[in-house]
């Protein structure tokens, strides 16, 4: 049975989509069968894997409102062993449309029942908010990866996210685990970067991944070519970091 991992942080610009795309691609390279669900209306995970989002007719929007199955919405992408349920700009409207539905927090969980056994990992790239979209992802997930950038105000909003996770555990999904806190955009030359790493490790100990994602120009270039970092430059620091993260997650889940 596949493990469902949500990549979530309501703070924007922390490396959430970068992590979703490159963790998916790295798991694929390590011969795991992966489904990436783009649950962010910005659709950057979809375009970051070479999918033309303008031409998406069936995607995560239809899966969430149960007008299409995950199988119908799944497309292939530029990364080996990775399939994608892409997003479309109309996903913006889903929160309003779901608000009157019974069991609205369980729409994604219910939809994924049919594909759970077909993949080793199902990753969900969450929107930078704590709305109904993210709530659906956390209710459907077995665990959550929380990217935290090594910059000023890094921990801002983290308490709020952890409280949301606690309330999801209490009300909707008692089995939800924290897979790990992932430090991103680390620059060893900066004192601030090192201070953030120290502070996060001191506060959260074992919850923090050993792998740290370094700031890397290739990582920021890759999405504009519709490629993961592995495809774009397999020798880059970014590729090494995300392969290490994938190995760490596989090892943890053996």
Q: What are these model-derived regions, one by one?
A:
Residues 1-254:
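P-loop NTP-binding core
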């Amino acid at each position: 049975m596949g493990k469902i991992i949500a990549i979530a942080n309501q703070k924007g610009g922390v490396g959430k989509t970068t992590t979703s795309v490159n963790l998916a691609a790295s798991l694929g390279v390590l011969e795991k069968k992966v489904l990436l669900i783009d649950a962010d209306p910005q659709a950057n995970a979809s375009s970051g894997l070479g999918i033309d989002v303008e031409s998406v007719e069936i995607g995560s929007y239809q899966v969430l409102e149960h007008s299409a199955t995950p199988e119908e919405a799944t497309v292939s992408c530029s990364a080996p062993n990775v399939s994608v349920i892409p997003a479309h700009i109309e996903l913006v409207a889903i929160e309003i449309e779901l608000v009157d539905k019974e069991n609205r927090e369980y729409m994604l969980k219910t939809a994924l029942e049919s594909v759970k056994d077909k993949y080793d990992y199902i990753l969900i790239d969450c929107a930078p908010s704590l709305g109904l979209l993210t709530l659906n992802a956390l209710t459907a997930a077995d665990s959550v990866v929380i990217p935290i950038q090594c910059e000023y105000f890094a921990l801002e909003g983290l308490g709020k996210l952890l409280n949301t996770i606690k309330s999801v555990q209490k009300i909707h999904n008692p089995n939800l685990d924290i897979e790990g806190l992932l430090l991103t955009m680390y620059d060893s030359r900066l004192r601030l970067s090192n201070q953030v790493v120290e502070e996060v490790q001191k506060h959260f100990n074992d919850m923090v991944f050993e792998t740290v994602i370094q700031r890397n120009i290739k990582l920021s270039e890759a999405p504009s070519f519709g490629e993961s970092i592995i495809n774009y430059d397999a020798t880059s620091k970014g590729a090494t970091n995300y392969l290490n993260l994938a190995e760490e997650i596989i090892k943890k889940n053996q």
